[in-house]
Amino acid sequence: MAVAANKRSVMNLYSHADDMYSHQTRIALAEKGVGVDIHLVDMDNLPDDLFELNPYGTIPTLIDRDLALYEAKIIIEYLDERFPHPPLMPVYPVSRGRSRLMMHRIEQDWYSLAKIILSGPADAASKARTELRESLLSIAPILNEAPYFMSEDFSLVDCYLAPLLWRLPVFGIELDGQGSKELKTYMLRLFERESFQASLTETERELRFGNPV
């Protein structure tokens, strides 16, 4: 799989076909129009050269010439600084700080619930599913304020949210009731972006097959 392989300098990304963190990096790369060769790896059979580049053998791992980066947050912020246009973070320090805090909260509050839903005991998964659904619906007022999450422009915060929202059918979460209209509108806006569509693996496309927003 390759994203925009004819643009700018070609990088290499070790990615999983269905992983929220890998998905974040693929969205950011597509937004930047960066040439990248994407290597989809089997987590049960990691390539030896990955450990030569990343001592932890974790996914995603980005290679840019002699630089190897791992951890999605580090990778996407590096990409935003390495390729300034289009910017995916606010210009002003206070706004940048708020964006970083929001990304941290999304990971701590929502990604953690997603992990429980996917791999936790049945009772814990059911509780996490309810908590995640209610928490997502509660942000509806924020989504009424701007086209993207607390911003007029697509940002790294949206890169964090999009992979999570795309997987709601997998989590067994249906959106209805108060706040669902606003959230669904926001989701469609994200999912219809050219960069988001370019970021999807075949595995990820199948996640929503027959599961419209």
Please describe what each predicted stretch is.
Residues M1-P141, P147:
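GST-like domain detector, emphasizing the conserved glutathione-binding G-site
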Residues H16, L156, T203:
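Short, solvent-exposed turn/loop segments enriched in Gly/Ser/Thr/Pro and often Arg
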Residues H39, A72, Q178, L200-T201:
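Residue-level detector of family-conserved "landmark" positions at structurally sensitive sites
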Residues F51, P60, A125, V170-F171, ...:
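A generic membrane alpha-helix/interface feature
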Residues R65, A162, E202:
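Conserved residues at the C-terminal ends of beta-strands
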Residues I106-S199:
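GST-like fold's C-terminal all-alpha helical module
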Residues E202-V213:
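Acidic/histidine-enriched, glycine/proline-rich intrinsically disordered or flexible terminal extensions
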